[in-house]
């Protein structure tokens, strides 16, 4: 009986780890606003975002609402150019 219980606990733990590993990038990645520096020209002036910018946006996608609420970054993240940049990169504009 104890052996069966141990197997169930191990199975549940493994399942939890698989779910965490499969979670969207924002759930795993640390929020690092500095990763968005490559998007500055797109966010500030509406320039076409680079592939690197789009990749970094994808990696930081789970952090957008946190950035939008931050007094340092919020005005940029909520700007029309930022929304256009997200759309150009094929990302949904978050509703925070």
From Swiss-Prot:
Its main location: secreted. One of its GO terms (biological process) is lipid transport. Disulfide bonds join 31-63, 39-53, 54-89, 65-96. SUPFAM superfamilies: Bifunctional inhibitor/lipid-transfer protein/seed storage 2S albumin (SSF47699). Residues 1-29 form the signal peptide. Gene3D superfamilies: Plant lipid-transfer and hydrophobic proteins. GO terms for molecular function: lipid binding. It is found in: Secreted, Cell wall. CDD domains: nsLTP2. Keywords: Cell wall, Cell wall biogenesis/degradation, Disulfide bond, Lipid transport, Lipid-binding, Secreted, Signal, Transport. One of its GO terms (cellular component) is extracellular region. Belongs to the plant LTP family. B11E subfamily. Transfer lipids across membranes. May play a role in plant defense or in the biosynthesis of cuticle layers. This is Non-specific lipid-transfer protein 2G. It comes from Triticum aestivum (Wheat). The lineage of its organism: Eukaryota, Viridiplantae, Streptophyta, Embryophyta, Tracheophyta.
